[in-house]
Amino acid sequence: MTTHPEGQTAILTTPDGTRLAYRDHHPAPAEAAGPLLLLHGLAGHQGEWDALARRLRSDGHRVVTYDARGHGASTRVPASTSRAAHVRDAVTVIGELSLAPVTLIGQSLGGHTAMLLAADHPDLVRSLVLVEAGPGGPNPDLPGRIAGWLDSWPTPFTSLEQARDFLGHEAWTRTLRKRGDGWYASFDRDVMIDSVAELATTAYWPQWSRITCPTLLVQGENGTMRPGEPERMLTLRPGTHHRLIPGAAHDVHLDQPDRLHQAIRTFLRTPPASP
């Protein structure tokens, strides 16, 4: 495998030909804690994790991030947008970079991918952190809500400042593309909608129930998890740690990176017993 300068974006290719852009951040001077793989949410990109990644590196962790298929600098229109394809991508990253056993930290759709991976590949996963993510469903109105949200973007944005104000955080502006009349999303709208299609018809409680690794569930105080979902998750797996982050909405990693870092650090240093 080709090595790349610290923190620079590199590319690996999955078995179905999808190109994944990733960054491999090693701690200095030497790794003192286990590796972490961070998975972003729908319509996001790996740069969302920058603030948290810096904090985790300071704890001695090797931190790997990547753009999910259809996102960021990865293949824009991949051959598949299925949940299984997203899991295979994460498995490929883990294998190519020799990360196993790894702690998975995933937010929203990235957390869902991490959850499925932990259920299906327990040998690869040391522990699991879900940020505003869970197995609940089916959610038949989800594709329509995502379509409505994407269609509400007032593109072209006339400036990055306007985009930041609308999208809620500067991190969301970093993958916008400049055209002659303004700034546009870099992703394909239909790919985003297709990426959540299975969540409209499927619940993933069996997968959640068979996870055996130590797990932390993080909610934002003003997050968007479905009513009753966290409570059911804790009932089915009572060994799960649960943290509610004050002052955070769905994007906990952007709203409260310090508090999220503290929750993760505490969890990793005193992991709960496997259920």
Predicted regions: what they are:
Residues 33-41:
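Short beta-strand element of the alpha/beta-hydrolase
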Residues 248-257, 261:
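Catalytic histidine-centered segment of alpha/beta-hydrolase-like enzymes
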Residues 115-119, 126-156:
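Flexible "cap/lid" loop of the alpha/beta hydrolase fold
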Residues 41-44, 108:
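Active-site glycine-rich loops that stabilize anionic/oxyanionic intermediates
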Residues 184-236, 241:
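Conserved serine/cysteine hydrolase catalytic core
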Residues 15-18, 26, 50-58, 64-105, ...:
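Active-site loop/oxyanion-hole signature of alpha/beta-hydrolase fold enzymes
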Residues 106, 110, 114:
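Gly/Ala-rich beta-loop-alpha elbow adjacent to hydrolase catalytic centers
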Residues 143, 156-207:
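Conserved alpha/beta-hydrolase catalytic His-Asp/Glu region
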